Amino acid sequence: MVNVPKTRQTFCKKYDKHQPHKVTQYKKGKDSLYALGKRRYDRKQSGYGGHTKPIFWKKAKTTKKIVLRLECVEPNCRSERMLATKRCKHFELGGDKTRKGQVIQF
């Protein structure tokens, strides 16, 4: 279980020094219907017949890499950057600090 604080003192490219940053978890945006690959795929799928491209079944990974979105809290900066972390099954943002040997509750 990974617990990350909601704020972090880290380097800001705009100010060229360490500044406090607000930490949030990156989430993938909705796929566009008008991207060329999607338009081509939909065109190929239309009409009679089954799938024209193979559907991927052989998934290997059980977790995703956590990506943190760091936003500078300075009002006239607000620059953002992404920071990839390791894989984990349970991710928590700004949770209570746990003591050694304490039972984990989900």
From Swiss-Prot:
<keyword id="KW-0963">Cytoplasm</keyword>
<keyword id="KW-0687">Ribonucleoprotein</keyword>
<comment type="function">
    <text>Component of the large ribosomal subunit. The ribosome is a large ribonucleoprotein complex responsible for the synthesis of proteins in the cell.</text>
</comment>
<dbReference type="GO" id="GO:0003735">
    <property type="term" value="F:structural constituent of ribosome"/>
</dbReference>
<comment type="similarity">
    <text>Belongs to the eukaryotic ribosomal protein eL42 family.</text>
</comment>
<dbReference type="InterPro" id="IPR000552">
    <property type="entry name" value="Ribosomal_eL44"/>
</dbReference>
<keyword id="KW-0689">Ribosomal protein</keyword>
<dbReference type="InterPro" id="IPR053708">
    <property type="entry name" value="Ribosomal_LSU_eL42"/>
</dbReference>
<dbReference type="GO" id="GO:0005737">
    <property type="term" value="C:cytoplasm"/>
</dbReference>
<dbReference type="InterPro" id="IPR011332">
    <property type="entry name" value="Ribosomal_zn-bd"/>
</dbReference>
<dbReference type="GO" id="GO:0005840">
    <property type="term" value="C:ribosome"/>
</dbReference>
<dbReference type="GO" id="GO:1990904">
    <property type="term" value="C:ribonucleoprotein complex"/>
</dbReference>
<dbReference type="Pfam" id="PF00935">
    <property type="entry name" value="Ribosomal_L44"/>
</dbReference>
<dbReference type="GO" id="GO:0006412">
    <property type="term" value="P:translation"/>
</dbReference>
<protein>
    <recommendedName>
        <fullName>Large ribosomal subunit protein eL42</fullName>
    </recommendedName>
</protein>
<comment type="subunit">
    <text>Component of the large ribosomal subunit.</text>
</comment>
